Amino acid sequence: DYETVEACLRVAETGHLTFSTLHTNSAAESISRIIDIFPSQYQSQIRIMLSMSLEGVLTQALLPRADGKGRVLAMEILIPNPAIRNLIRENKIHQIYSAMQMGQEKFGMQTFNQSLADLYFRGLITQEADHAGDGDECHVLP
């Protein structure tokens, strides 16, 4: 709810480590969800607050292992660098995915698709597991 998210942002702004969970399929979707909780007249201010205080977004999914022995973690990692912070501030959330792809080596970011490809090529998941991950993105597996 609005009051809880606002309180979390204020606490994070003062330098306190703050964790939250959201049911979203990507880092960009998580950021949008936080911003969209607020009335439109406050969203610009919230984008600024979020761009300054956000330290990371981890999106995760547990997928069936190829060997049938449990599950394996697929994850998207967003680490806000100056470019990401600027995209949040300027309400260009739709460009975050591309910035994450470009920031993989230098900043340690990883898109969900990159994680899926890694798991697949290491033999940890099958094509079927890739397509079960989330239905919103174009997956990289054959």
Where are these regions (language model features)?
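Short, flexible helix-loop junctions that flank or precede catalytic/ligand sites
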Residues: 1-142
